[in-house]
Amino acid sequence: MDPNTWSADLFQLASQWQEKGLLTRYNVFMAISITVTALYLIHKGISRARSFRAPLVGRRFSWEPKWLIGLRFSQYGLEHLMEGCKRFNDGIFKVARNDTDILVIPNRYVDELHSKPEEHISAIKAHMKNLLGKYSTIDILQEGNLHTHVLQTKLTPNLGSLMSTIEEELRFAMTEEIPSTHEDWKDVSIYDIILHLVARISARVFVGQPTCRNQEWLDTSIRFTEHAFLTLAILRRLPKFLHPIVAPLLPSYWAVHRDLQTAKRIISPIVKQRTADEASGEPGYKKPTDLLQWMIDVASPRDGQPDKLAHRQLVLSLAAIHTTTMAVAYAIYDLCQFPEYVEPLRQEITDSLEQDGKWAKTTLTKMHKLDSFIKESQRLSPPSLLSFQRIVMQEVTLSDGTALPKGTHISVPAAEVLQGKAFDSSFDGFRYSRRRQNSGEAHKYQFATTDKNSLHFGHGKYACPGRFFAAYEIKMIISHLLMDYDFRFPPGTSRPKVFSADEVLLPDPSTRVLMHRRTDSAHSNCH
């Protein structure tokens, strides 16, 4: 039986007994206390029975309870992981999150694990566990691979034809979201500006016009992620068996469900109308070219239900908006910190545009220096310290004889500082463009390329299916911002510190940047 189910049943039973006069309030409190304690011990026993025996890092005293170690990991995840990588160089160790133990394995195992089927080690189960799918509502992704299939077979192959659409929406978004800076430098929240640019572009590609300019949809797609992550940030600090008890007490939990209802109210009628329009056979019918339409086209009758498609659209917004926003924000911070890169990048953008005469996929592909700059920015400011997270579904024996028991949550260090090699902490924006000049390595060092040493998008069959769209979107946004604006930090400030929440790294969203429209703006050359 599932301890989570036990807790709900026992609490309901206690309430019924109280209503019948069988328990006083004191006895109810005692019954609940005993239940919680018993469930904790059961949960701990089950976890221990399934656990891979490995040293646990982050413990300060031998008698220290694990929940305290897990609580510290939520704030000092980088320190715990660095301790483990230093003490057990190229070895295996554990870190404690309060909702689970994570077994950290060296990246040398990636090549033999990435091809194993989902029935052996599951990426989707790890995503559900990390993002608390039951409480964030992303568990709909377990119902099928519709989103992955459409991203891989429809979005990525059509990126070339979508470039003019993306550029058009970006231009519109910049006029809507960036305040007028013609006269002087303006102090702005650059993260917030980028967030709304990304949300608008993503909406144009995902749901098309006119919905992409529906302010309620844009707000919902942004807030959903914020509400979901606030919910999981709180629940992750608690043992798993407490999640069904605490979640309904959180305002953010209910906000997630309100966001979902809003998404269904906006998107479901569009799905029904599109289906009816296509079925009508009208001569003037023109099928939309966006992710929603591709989902309608290939979905099974079950997956194609309007409410389910609306739900998937909202979850895809969660995946697309904030990680892309962070990548662009970090790159802008690095341009402020290292302004010597600005002019070489502008020259590359200008040269690429002159060769193609317009914004095209090939235009962005030519920008090796910009691609390198973004990759270097990500190297020093990764979105997560861990990647390649999997749940072992049946015991797996590695090539060196290491046996991973069923139920083990495994991961690999993604941040280069954790990968057991000499770490260069200096910023070298063109590091990867130089490496791409070597024979046979033109593709190896691209921003969207994955391998055992570059895991920010995952690796293998379950690498991020939208990473190519993200890479082109990031380059498109940075190119336009660079050509039209100058940036610098306000006097007395510098690149903001990064916050740690478990293994996730987050920029300070309150960071201010001075922004000024260039008098010699290349706006006219950007078409």
From Swiss-Prot:
Subcellular location: Membrane
Biochemical pathway: Secondary metabolite biosynthesis; terpenoid biosynthesis
Membrane-spanning segments: 21-43
Any one cellular-component term (Gene Ontology): membrane
UniProt topology in membrane: Single-pass membrane protein
UniProt feature coiled coil, ranges: none
Effect of loss of the gene: Abolishes the production of 15-deoxyoxalicine B and accumulates decaturin D and decaturin G.
One GO process term, biological-process aspect: terpenoid biosynthetic process
Amino acids binding heme: 464
Transferase keyword on record: no
UniProt GO molecular function: heme binding; iron ion binding; monooxygenase activity; oxidoreductase activity, acting on paired donors, with incorporation or reduction of molecular oxygen
Family the UniProt entry places it in: Belongs to the cytochrome P450 family.
Function of the molecule: Cytochrome P450 monooxygenase; part of the gene cluster that mediates the biosynthesis of 15-deoxyoxalicine B. The first step of the pathway is the synthesis of nicotinyl-CoA from nicotinic acid by the nicotinic acid-CoA ligase olcI. Nicotinyl-CoA is then a substrate of polyketide synthase olcA to produce 4-hydroxy-6-(3-pyridinyl)-2H-pyran-2-one (HPPO) which is further prenylated by the polyprenyl transferase olcH to yield geranylgeranyl-HPPO. Geranylgeranyl pyrophosphate is provided by the cluster-specific geranylgeranyl pyrophosphate synthase olcC.
Major localization class: membrane
PANTHER family: CYTOCHROME P450, CYTOCHROME P450 MONOOXYGENASE AN1598-RELATED
Keywords: Heme, Iron, Membrane, Metal-binding, Monooxygenase, Oxidoreductase, Transmembrane, Transmembrane helix
Cofactor: heme
Miscellaneous field: The 15-deoxyoxalicine B cluster is a rare cluster that contains its own geranylgeranyl pyrophosphate synthase (olcC), in contrast to other related clusters which rely on a FPP/GGPP synthase localized outside of the cluster.
Recorded superkingdom: Eukaryota
Name of the protein: Cytochrome P450 monooxygenase olcJ
A Pfam family hit: p450
Lyase recorded as keyword: no
UniProt cross-references to InterPro entries, sorted A to Z: Cyt_P450, Cyt_P450_E_grp-IV, Cyt_P450_sf
Organism: Penicillium canescens
Enzyme class, broadest EC rank: oxidoreductase
